[in-house]
Each structure stands twice: as C-alpha cells, then as structure tokens.
Amino acid sequence: MSKTTDLVTADELERFPRDDRRYELVEGRVIPMSPVGYQHGKVVLQLGFLLSRYLKSQPVGVVMTEVGFKLEFGPDTVRAPDIAFIRAHRIPANTRGFFTGPPDLAIEVLSPDDRPSDVRAKVDQYLARGVALVVVVDPDQKTVTTWRPSTPPVPLRAEEDRLDLGDVIQGFSCSLREIFE
C-alpha cells in the first residue's frame, strides 16, 4: 500500500496475495467482493457458455470472466465484470495482468446483497469509460436490462424476450429462457 495515503494503485492490487478473495478498486479504494451464490454462479456459467459457443463459430473476439479492467488512473479504478467481451482487434500482445481500458461488453449478474445504487454507479462508470454495452442480469427476478451510451435502459422480462448483443457481437442473441434454464 502507498505510504503517503491509504489509496492503492492498480499495480499494487495486482500484487495482492492470490487467496481466493476477489477485489475491485474504486478511485484507489479496495472493495472486497463476496463469494457468489448458487444462482449467480449458474447464470454466469450459462451465459458464458452461450457466448463461448457462439464465438467458436464467429471468432470476433474473446469472452472471459472476472478479469480486471483498468478504467481510471490517479486514483486508479479496476473493475471486474462477471463476464466481459473484447473485440479481437483490441486484444493486446501481452495479456498478463489487468486489461488496460474498458471491455466492449460488460455483464454483471446481481447477487442478493447488491445495492441498486452501487449497481447503477458501476453501470454509469462502465458507460462513461467507453463500454459499448452493459448488461445487468437479475437471477432472482429472471430479468435482464441492457444499457447503452446515451440511450435509456431496455428491460427484458419475458422468457421469450431476446438478449441481442448484435451491436457488439454481430449476430449473437439468446432468449431469457436460455440464460435462466
């Protein structure tokens, strides 16, 4: 940790012990992340699987889980969406450590203890830093909300509603039923 302040840098966060704890960094402050529950883990895996399967046939980028993205510097902010997508042309030669810059797509799956104000702040931060599409999935309500820059959020509630990521991952869509099965 820095001697002059209580703020932590992204480089310092990367050197934290790998002890199965997860952290995010918000304006230099370490935010511990709780372990996820059953529904959260199931939805992350299912949606990640759907995206991975599609990207095998259409290799336009890479999908990953819980990767740290350096979004702000001085003080540093590192966010780790539950699922993220980066277009192929943005993948750096050196993929060690946190990714510098925003993902093209950030997906957050809600946990029961997530506060709406915290989720909204995270969505706003992603959009302000250049994320093209933010998806918030609520496993308890079985709903999905999509957020794009300068447009109102779009809620999806019915099993037949389709999550369309075509503006980021061309051709990809799936029904809510597929996400929550």
Where are these regions (language model features)?
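Gly/Pro/Ser/Thr-rich low-complexity, intrinsically disordered segments predominantly at protein N-termini
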Residues: M1-E181
